[in-house]
Amino acid sequence: MALSRRLRLRLYARLPDFFLLLLFRGCMIEAVNLKSSNRNPVVHEFESVELSCIITDSQTSDPRIEWKKIQDGQTTYVYFDNKIQGDLAGRTDVFGKTSLRIWNVTRSDSAIYRCEVVALNDRKEVDEITIELIVQVKPVTPVCRIPAAVPVGKTATLQCQESEGYPRPHYSWYRNDVPLPTDSRANPRFQNSSFHVNSETGTLVFNAVHKDDSGQYYCIASNDAGAARCEGQDMEVYDLNIAGIIGGVLVVLIVLAVITMGICCAYRRGCFISSKQDGESYKSPGKHDGVNYIRTSEEGDFRHKSSFVI
């Protein structure tokens, strides 16, 4: 008898918890709730993507649905008043009552999208969910800068750059269609070379080029959306002709010496001295000084007589 009495007391003590649980479940059922099958979709440019927004619980048969786009700190409408808005108009439709499907996505569609549902007949009338869309862009043809010729033992830098791909591409270099390792020391095949490849910046740096480094080089830029390569370009590694350089310098010095000697000889012979007029030079009078000059036929010379000016 005492045992059954204790059991009844325990049941009575648990009744409030039971009623609270029922009340809580009732409130949950009467509150609108959303979920998404993929809150971080990733898609390649020019493909289609679905932005999933699913109502799991609601007592409202016709809730109000809105979609907004958040990009660079600005919020704009995507779906409002049962119409697609903004730059997504014409390539977006609504499916499953609350989800969006975007056709022919572009890189400008990368943003955070917010699905908002207003259910006026529910205790909790509003719920929202955010979805981050990432659009990956295939790289375009990279720009490669490759020196045409480099002397043996000198440093050389090959550059590869691409600016359109997203996420940022990684770079790899090829010589005669053979991929180059990041570090030449890591592969015995390139033991005669001394280079390093930076896959982030696209540079290929030779510390000291060797004859075996001659060949055709090209670069490939790649990311998750695809890859692109530049046209192959030849790089020649040549030996320095020391004897030829010395001979050329000697020839220049000899030519300069011959020219100098020729100038000196010409100067000694008076080729650079201006000839003077024969006889005595005279200076023409600058102004009339009051003296008349009379030439006599007997003397054949100039004589003067004084004249007085009154």
Curated annotation (Swiss-Prot):
The chain crosses the membrane at residues 242-262. SUPFAM superfamilies: Immunoglobulin. Gene3D superfamilies: Immunoglobulins (2.60.40.10). Residues 35-127 form the Ig-like V-type domain. Its main location: membrane. Glycans are attached at N104, N192. Keywords: Angiogenesis, Cell adhesion, Cell junction, Cell membrane, Differentiation, Disulfide bond, Glycoprotein, Immunoglobulin domain, Lipoprotein, Membrane, Palmitate, Secreted, Signal, Spermatogenesis, Tight junction, Transmembrane, Transmembrane helix. GO terms for molecular function: cell-cell adhesion mediator activity; identical protein binding; integrin binding; protein heterodimerization activity; protein homodimerization activity. GO terms for biological process: adaptive immune response; adherens junction assembly; angiogenesis; apical protein localization; cell adhesion; cell migration; cell-cell adhesion; cell-matrix adhesion. Colocalizes with Jam2 near the lumen of seminiferous tubulues. Detected at junctional plaques that correspond to cell-cell contacts between spermatids and Sertoli cells. Detected on endothelial cells, in brain vessels and kidney glomeruli (at protein level). Detected in heart, lung, liver, kidney, testis, thymus, lymph node and Peyer patch. Endothelial cells. InterPro entries: Ig-like_dom, Ig-like_dom_sf, Ig-like_fold, Ig_sub, Ig_sub2, Ig_V-set, JAM-C. It comes from the Eukaryota. GO terms for cellular component: bicellular tight junction; cell surface; cell-cell contact zone; cell-cell junction; desmosome; extracellular space; filamentous actin; Golgi apparatus. A lipid is attached at C264, C265 (S-palmitoyl cysteine). Disulfide bonds join C53-C115, C160-C219. Pfam families: Ig_3, V-set. Residues 1-29 form the signal peptide. It is a single-pass type I membrane protein. Junctional adhesion protein that mediates heterotypic cell-cell interactions with its cognate receptor JAM2 to regulate different cellular processes. Plays a role in homing and mobilization of hematopoietic stem and progenitor cells within the bone marrow. At the surface of bone marrow stromal cells, it contributes to the retention of the hematopoietic stem and progenitor cells expressing JAM3. Plays a central role in leukocytes extravasation by facilitating transmigration through the endothelium. This is Junctional adhesion molecule C. The gene is Jam3.
